[in-house]
Regions:
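Flavin-dependent oxidoreductase catalytic cores
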Residues: 1-348
């Protein structure tokens, strides 16, 4: 009998039964090939998390539209047909241990024209966001034309289809952390005068349409997870009450919410998106708990989690249905198995 019964109770997400409530949070790697293909070492990295007992293992920030969406160098680009073999092998490596393979569909938006991290790509690419902008780097951001919006929508559907064909059992649509959909959602970023700007309903239109394209691609019952902020922590941005409203708007289109916060590309907010050791463990759980009060679909929380007792309490108390772990699983991929066996003292 495990000392953490809530943590190891199966849960059904869409038509998929997940063996426990411990998910590997989306993580990417800077060691993919220059073309964004997974190496055997990359596959082993994700496989080890599955072998260690996670219910779901997630590949992070995989780009749906390489020409306009790459925020870093060496990202998986799902519109590259040559990436399919390494994706397929990775999904097989994950699922052979009874975990579900998940992949995060993303687009960098206005941050996708910057000089790439790692320096592989030297050409200048135009950056597109909801509205014209000048970044702190001095780079000009162009307003995304409607033609490109619809091209990007097609790319989300195509990327979801690729993921399903590769053997992934779930997809995550990234709508937080300052990336494309978060930019469109934010009144601070989005000053458009067309149907994709103005009210929250209009600012959310792009996201809702993308979720519809993903559903059309994967079909009924296939789990769709949305990653969204619970608070931007930015003056003029969206806050918890706004995100409660957004959650109600998207609920019929998704099977699972992942509630995070902040922004990847703003240094003062990065610490909330990726909480350091100087912040309280589980410092963002309250956002997931608040969103859980207004929707009926399952909720996962993320950020500075790793103590099995705390994770058990989060689920037992109804604050969230699932815990997503990042650095804790990097430190010890076998954390789930050790927790199940009551070997907390052996967790790295």
């Amino acid at each position: 009998m495990t000392p953490y019964p809530h943590l190891f109770t199966p849960i059904k997400i869409g038509g998929q039964l997940i063996k426990n409530r411990i998910f590997s949070a989306p993580t990417g790697l800077m060691s993919y090939t220059a073309r964004g293909h997974l190496t055997t070492e990359n596959m082993a990295y994700y496989e080890l998390k599955a072998k260690g007992g996670c219910g779901v293992v997630t590949l992070g920030e995989s780009i749906v539209h390489a020409a306009t969406g790459q925020s870093h160098d060496r990202q998986i680009c799902l519109d590259d047909p040559h990436v399919l073999p390494s994706l397929t092998n990775t999904a097989r490596a994950i699922t052979r241990y009874g975990a579900v393979a998940n992949i995060e569909l993303s687009h960098g938006g206005k941050y996708a024209g910057l000089a790439s991290i790692g320096g592989h790509k030297k050409e200048r690419r135009p950056a597109y966001g909801p509205s014209h902008d000048i970044l702190p780097s001095g780079e000009e951001v162009l307003e995304m034309p409607q033609k490109l919006i619809y091209e990007t929508l097609d790319a989300y559907g195509a990327a979801a289809d690729v993921a399903k064909r590769a053997g992934f059992g779930m997809v995550m649509v990234h709508a937080g952390h300052g990336w494309l959909f978060n930019q469109f959602l934010s009144p601070l970023e989005n000053h458009r005068k067309d149907e994709f700007g103005g009210s929250l309903e209009n600012r959310a239109r792009f996201l809702l349409m993308a979720l519809d394209r993903v559903r059309q691609a994967v079909g009924p019952g296939f789990p769709i997870q949305i990653r969204m902020n619970g608070d931007d922590f930015t003056e003029g941005g969206l806050h918890l009450e706004d995100y409660k409203e957004l959650a109600r708007m998207v609920e019929s289109r998704v099977d699972l919410f992942n509630i995070s916060c902040g922004s990847h590309e703003r240094q003062e907010l990065f610490v909330r998106t990726h909480p350091s050791a100087f912040l309280d463990h589980g410092c963002n759980v309250y956002l997931a708990a608040a969103i859980k009060q207004v929707v009926s679909k399952p909720i996962s929380c993320v950020g500075a989690l790793g103590d099995p007792e705390q994770c058990e309490e989060i689920i037992a108390s109804g604050q969230a249905d699932i815990v997503e772990l990042g650095r804790a699983l990097l430190a010890d991929p076998f954390l789930p198995k050790k927790a199940y066996a009551g070997q907390k003292e052996d967790i790295t």
